[in-house]
Amino acid sequence: MELRFLKEDDHDFVMSLEHRVTEESFRQRIAARNSFVLWEQGERVGLLSYFILWERIPFLNHLILCESRRGEGLGTQAMALWEDFLRENGYRIAVLSTQVDERAQFLYRRLGYVDCGGLVFHGTPFDQPLELFLRKVL
């Protein structure tokens, strides 16, 4: 597994995998260098993106794998590589979120992330189940 910074030639892959991304946000991600394409044996297999919260806390906002490659341990590998990248760049904590009805929470807990709060969106334009926040000291 290899994490490579997002580039222009990843456009079609990203658009096929993450339907909420816009042309503008795609370009912003390239410029910000906060998104990686996940590569396995010469093939694009997923996308990982994050942003920095309060100038010092990395917040994972997307880890998406190609549907055909799920269940192979690639998410675990991608998280380990991302956490190594964060440590190498001086970060000591990582934060992420997932809806409580998504399976990803079990992966994150297995990797050492602990629950640290949640947001309720019921009755808002973003009506969805509870958004669960998790953190890990690196």
Across the structure, where does each feature detected by a protein language model lie?
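Acetyl-CoA-dependent GNAT
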Residues: 2-62, 66-67, 79, 85, ...
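Short hydrophobic/aromatic beta-strand or adjacent loop that forms the aromatic wall/cage
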Residues: 33-35, 129-133
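Active-site beta-strand termini and strand-to-loop segments that position acidic
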Residues: 39-41, 135-138
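Conserved beta-strand segments that form the floor/walls of ligand-binding pockets within enzyme
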Residues: 59, 64, 95-97, 133
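Conserved acetyl-CoA-binding loop-helix of GNAT-fold acetyltransferases
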Residues: 71-84, 109-110
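Short glycine/proline-centered loop/turn elements that form peptide/ligand docking sites
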Residues: 75, 79, 101-104, 121-127
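Conserved GNAT acetyl-CoA-binding A-motif
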Residues: 86-98
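Conserved catalytic-core motifs of GNAT/GCN5-like acyltransferases
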Residues: 95-97, 114-131
